[in-house]
């Protein structure tokens, strides 16, 4: 049994090649998901995330 929860992608989001965004995840505006990442939790706005599972690498906000 899979999950039918929607994936919500904000504005100006970059999802790089080979990334997987799991069901129920919300990706905030301006976020970047690095190549090959597996996103299992919500991504805050303007965060740069990467890895398996994806973790916050840095924030794009000044």
Which sequence ranges carry the predicted segments?
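Nucleotide-sugar donor-binding patch of glycosyltransferase catalytic domains
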Residues: 51, 62
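Conserved catalytic-core motifs of eukaryotic protein kinase domains, centered on the activation segment
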Residues: 25, 59-61
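Multi-pass alpha-helical transporter architecture, strongest
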Residues: 54-56
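Left-handed beta-helix
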Residues: 5, 10-11, 16-17, 22-23, ...
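Surface-exposed acidic, glycine/proline-enriched linker/cap segments
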Residues: 1-3
